[in-house]
């Protein structure tokens, strides 16, 4: 179940690409300040306020983070990318997938990331309502294909290779 631990980096790549390709926002980094000497980008109210689209993004983020008195400057993450997709993507299926991915991060990955705990499909389904296979096959693959990170044929070759590896491991046992 190391897949669950790796969901945040995968989600970042998927959501960045979704913002870039499936919304009018484009590259989120144009609304960021790059931290000197580091490869980190701070999404800032100042940068967002410099264009009409940026102001619309800021409004969506303020609504999302109203519980903490609105959006605050931060190194952007899936927590900021998801509401941008929600506000600017027209594909409801993608928005639903993004919500599931964020839910998996919040209710599954984040609580177990720094503890020693046995994770199985029962625990996963209990916390997020779907199994790891469903999360991977029905959600992550769909977003990756939609943002053209991977073609369906590529997934099929990975699936075929995984089946072959599983068969070989079983033969050795």
How does the language model describe each region?
Residues 70-86, 105-113, 170-173:
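Long, charged low-complexity terminal regions
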Residues 1-81, 163-164:
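Amphipathic alpha-helical interface elements
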Residues 52, 61, 65, 89, ...:
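Generic secondary-structure transition motif, activating predominantly at the C-termini of alpha-helices
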Residues 61, 82, 151, 167-170:
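Residue-level marker of intrinsically disordered, low-complexity segments enriched
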Residues 159, 163-171:
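Conserved non-transmembrane functional hotspots
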Residues 84-160:
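Charge-enriched, short contiguous segments at helix-coil
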């Amino acid at each position: 179940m190391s897949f669950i631990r790796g969901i945040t980096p995968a989600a970042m790549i998927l959501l960045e690409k979704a913002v870039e390709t499936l919304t009018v926002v484009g590259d989120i980094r144009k609304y960021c300040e790059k931290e000197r000497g580091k490869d980190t980008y701070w999404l800032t109210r100042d940068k967002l306020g410099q264009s009409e689209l940026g102001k619309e993004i800021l409004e969506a983020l303020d609504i999302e983070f109203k519980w903490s008195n609105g959006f605050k400057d931060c190194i952007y993450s899936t927590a900021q990318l998801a509401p941008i997709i929600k506000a600017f993507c027209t594909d409801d299926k993608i928005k639903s997938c993004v919500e599931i991915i964020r839910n998996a991060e919040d209710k599954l990955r984040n609580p177990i990331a720094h503890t020693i705990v046995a994770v199985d499909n029962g625990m996963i389904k209990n916390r997020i309502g779907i199994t790891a296979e469903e999360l991977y096959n029905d959600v992550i693959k769909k977003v990756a294909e939609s943002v053209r990170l991977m073609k369906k044929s590529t997934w099929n070759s990975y699936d075929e290779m995984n089946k072959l590896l599983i068969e070989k491991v079983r033969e050795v046992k």
